[in-house]
């Protein structure tokens, strides 16, 4: 790994951190160390990093802003690439927006609303990066990324980079082709929006933000929604009806505000969260005969 670190630093790809605690890079403030964490300064730096990784046959993992993510306590071996400030560009051309995978979804939604561009009102208050939103087809309030994405620049597992159209992304509820059939990460996205009355867009976004603040634990460290909604049921409602709000294992606690959120109540480990998830799944299965599948991405070394 020393040679990998040396080459990455020589190429000046951006920040290169050794044995970096990933709890510093996740919204739930949980996660063991990455052998090496690279925060690339631009897309070329991502390409250069991948060349080094492939040359040495080192395992690699990519993360965004750390929302909707649970990193296990043992951390992640190999190189972790964090898409952040180096990939946070945005260009507007009429009703089309090109945006980097590291760009904040909240910042994007707010910025385009001020330009009178509609299509991302649903994203008001959604934490995380554009790359992560594309990866999991993030959504709320009856809409999602698939409704506005034209194409996405994807870095695949084998290190190749290519554009995929909306159709090729094979979007469905909180899912894209990147999660299983063609594992990869989004470096850049092109979105098709619609010019509308600015005041109406801003008002709708504020309404969505207020709803999120009133119903979700935005002030506590959490990873976002833990479970996918087992349609037509809602995960949070099932957890609440089962009397599990406030249930705690170790430092992990089911939010008192919303049943589909687990918060870090202090000193929580990934094991605490996993044990709590398993307890919820078992309880819901026994009470309602419904299987609860996780929406949060769980990555890292298993003991």
Curated annotation (Swiss-Prot):
It is found in: Cytoplasm. Gene3D superfamilies: 3.30.465.10, UDP-N-acetylenolpyruvoylglucosamine reductase, C-terminal domain (3.90.78.10), Uridine Diphospho-n-acetylenolpyruvylglucosamine Reductase, domain 2 (3.30.43.10). GO terms for biological process: cell division; cell wall organization; peptidoglycan biosynthetic process; regulation of cell shape. The active site is at residues 174, 225, 295. Residues 29-196 form the FAD-binding PCMH-type domain. GO terms for molecular function: FAD binding; UDP-N-acetylmuramate dehydrogenase activity. It comes from Bacillus licheniformis (strain ATCC 14580 / DSM 13 / JCM 2505 / CCUG 7422 / NBRC 12200 / NCIMB 9375 / NCTC 10341 / NRRL NRS-1264 / Gibson 46). It holds the Pfam family MurB_C. Its EC number is 1.3.1.98. Keywords: Cell cycle, Cell division, Cell shape, Cell wall biogenesis/degradation, Cytoplasm, FAD, Flavoprotein, NADP, Oxidoreductase, Peptidoglycan synthesis. Cell wall formation. One of its GO terms (cellular component) is cytosol. Belongs to the MurB family. It comes from the Bacteria. Its cofactor is FAD. Pathway: Cell wall biogenesis; peptidoglycan biosynthesis. InterPro entries: FAD-bd_PCMH, FAD-bd_PCMH-like_sf, FAD-bd_PCMH_sub1, FAD-bd_PCMH_sub2, MurB, MurB_C, MurB_C_sf, Oxid_FAD_bind_N. This is UDP-N-acetylenolpyruvoylglucosamine reductase. It is an enzyme of class 1 (oxidoreductase). The lineage of its organism: Bacteria, Bacillati, Bacillota, Bacilli, Bacillales. It catalyses: UDP-N-acetyl-alpha-D-muramate + NADP(+) = UDP-N-acetyl-3-O-(1-carboxyvinyl)-alpha-D-glucosamine + NADPH + H(+).
């Amino acid at each position: 790994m020393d040679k990998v670190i040396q080459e990455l630093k020589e190429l000046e790809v951006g920040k290169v951190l050794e044995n970096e605690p990933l709890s510093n890079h996740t919204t739930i403030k949980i996660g063991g160390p990455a052998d090496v964490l690279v925060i690339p300064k631009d897309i070329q730096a991502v390409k250069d990093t991948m060349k080094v990784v492939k040359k040495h046959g080192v395992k690699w993992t990519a993360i965004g802003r750390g929302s909707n993510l649970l990193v296990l306590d043992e951390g992640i071996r190999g190189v972790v690439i964090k898409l952040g400030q180096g990939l946070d560009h945005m260009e507007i051309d009429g009703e089309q927006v090109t945006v980097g995978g590291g760009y904040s979804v909240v910042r994007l939604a707010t910025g385009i609303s001020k330009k009178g561009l509609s299509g991302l009102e649903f994203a008001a208050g959604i934490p995380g990066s554009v790359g992560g939103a594309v990866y999991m087809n993030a959504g709320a309030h009856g809409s999602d990324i698939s409704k506005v994405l034209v194409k996405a620049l994807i870095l695949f597992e084998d290190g190749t980079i290519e554009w995929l159209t909306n159709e090729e992304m094979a979007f469905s509820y909180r899912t894209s082709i990147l999660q299983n059939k063609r594992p990869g990460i989004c470096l850049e996205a092109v979105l098709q929006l619609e010019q509308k009355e600015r005041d109406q867009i801003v008002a709708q976004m504020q309404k969505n933000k207020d709803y999120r603040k009133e119903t979700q634990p935005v002030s506590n460290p959490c990873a976002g929604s833990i479970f996918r909604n087992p349609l037509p049921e809602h995960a949070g409602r099932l957890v609440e009806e089962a009397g599990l709000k406030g249930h705690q294992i170790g430092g992990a606690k089911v939010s008192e505000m919303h049943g589909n959120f687990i918060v870090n109540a202090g000193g929580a480990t990934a094991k605490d969260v996993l044990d709590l998830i398993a307890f919820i799944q078992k309880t819901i299965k026994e009470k309602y005969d419904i299987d609860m599948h996780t929406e949060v991405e769980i990555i890292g070394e298993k003991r």
